[in-house]
Regions:
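Outer membrane beta-barrel
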Residues: 36-206, 211-218, 222-231, 299-303, ...
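Intrinsically disordered, low-complexity regions enriched for glutamine and histidine
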Residues: 23, 43-46, 92, 195, ...
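N-terminal periplasmic/intermembrane-space "pro-region" immediately following the signal or transit peptide
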Residues: 3-64, 380
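Hydrophobic alpha-helical membrane context
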Residues: 14-18, 89, 280, 363
């Protein structure tokens, strides 16, 4: 079945790319415009339709954990982008410019998005380049829209952001090709009843070449019975190969629900099978720990003022790095967040969290503590 899906995806990509060559201009346009004129028009359209911008998220944080640094100031994110549309092709180039170059987690300045998508049909759009993996609700969401100061643990650890397997920080992205579309538009309000995504990725994360012949197959489907509500399912069959040549599986599935309307409700569960690179015991040529992990979260929030500038959110966020050990590795975060939109492109966010970390307590450190942070978001 997996080989069949791969073949179908490649065939669809080839078909759409070929079709795009004929869809760029009609026969009448082709007869009236020379190739040079058509090319010049496309370039002008690209220049006119390209927008440039960026955003910055600054953060001041504090905690009461024993043995930890109790306060900090940092630039959480600084990103610049150029995006637009030319004919039927949308494109996006985004860079993250904060961080320390050459850091172990590769958190320095880097390209995060570099993709182009053919969007002639709403039911079949083909995207190629470096982009978000088609896995989970939160992963493709902009940091401005999460409602909290960071993504959930499940999203961070199991969608390729700071992945548990040992992959470098990739912000949920990889290099690949994806087919997606919207099906069955509602006669009442026009929203699509079905959204699907399926793609092949290298499995090595952003800005890295492929290191094995296996391509990660990732896909999902969302059902939207009413506007604003979606029920979603995803699957991921992949492998990651480290710089030292250790290969680990990433076999994962997830299910989630999201509602955006008068209030916001979002929840997801994700299960993963596959060891970490660090789990390999070279001396004994055996794996240690457990190959299974899981995470889940539930969040809800709503505007509390008539102008909707002040919004309050609450969440429960749990992640188990290893399942079926003789002790618990579950880390649970109970959080509340308040954000105030000062202007359209300027907001202030306060996040308060109570953390219960069983794995940290097992190591003899303080695993029950509180954190607070104040974040300032601005766009330009």
């Amino acid at each position: 079945m997996e080989k069949l899906l791969r073949a179908v995806l490649v065939l669809c990509a080839a078909t759409i790319v070929c079709a795009s060559a004929f869809a760029i201009e009609s026969p009448a346009e082709a007869s009236s415009n020379s190739p040079a004129e058509a090319g010049s028009s496309a370039v002008k359209q690209a220049i006119q339709n390209t927008s440039f911008g960026g955003y910055v998220i600054g953060k001041a944080s504090a905690n009461n954990q024993e043995g930890a640094t109790h306060s900090n100031f940092e630039l959480r994110l600084v990103r610049l982008y150029a995006k637009g549309k030319m004919l039927d092709f949308a494109y996006n180039l985004q860079m993250q410019v904060n961080g320390i170059g050459g850091s172990a987690g590769e958190k320095g300045p880097r390209i995060v998005d570099a993709w182009i998508e053919w969007q002639h049909w709403t039911w079949a759009r083909i995207k190629f380049g470096q982009m978000k993996r088609a896995f989970m609700i939160e992963n493709p969401m902009n940091p401005w829209d999460i409602g909290f100061g960071t993504y959930s643990q499940a999203t961070s650890k199991l969608s390729g952001m700071s992945d548990r397997c040992g992959e470098h920080d990739s912000n949920g992205r990889d290099v690949g090709v994806q087919l997606q579309g919207d099906l069955l538009p509602s006669a009442r309000d026009g929203h699509a009843w079905v959204h699907y995504q399926v793609g092949l990725w290298t499995g090595q994360g952003i800005n890295h070449a492929d290191k094995n012949s296996h391509k990660d197959l990732i896909g999902g489907i969302g059902i939207s019975p009413v506007k604003g509500l979606s029920l979603n399912w995803w699957g991921w069959n992949g492998r990651y190969t480290s710089a030292t040549g250790i290969t680990v599986d990433r076999r994962r599935w997830a299910a989630g629900l999201q509602y955006n309307g008068a209030f916001t409700l979002r929840g997801e569960y994700v299960h993963s099978y596959g060891y970490k690179v660090s789990d390999w015991d070279a001396e004994n040529t055996a794996w240690k720990g457990s190959a299974k992990s899981q995470g889940w979260y539930v969040m809800a929030g709503a505007p509390v003022t008539r102008d909707k500038k002040l919004r309050i959110y609450g969440k429960v966020d749990a992640y188990s790095d290893y399942l079926h050990l003789d002790y618990s590795t579950t880390k649970t975060i109970y959080g509340i967040s308040a954000e105030y939109w000062i202007l359209k492109n300027l907001k202030l966010q306060l996040n308060l969290n109570q953390i219960d970390d069983n794995a940290t307590e097992h190591r003899g450190a303080d695993g029950s503590y509180s954190t607070a942070d104040l974040q300032l978001y601005w766009r330009f």
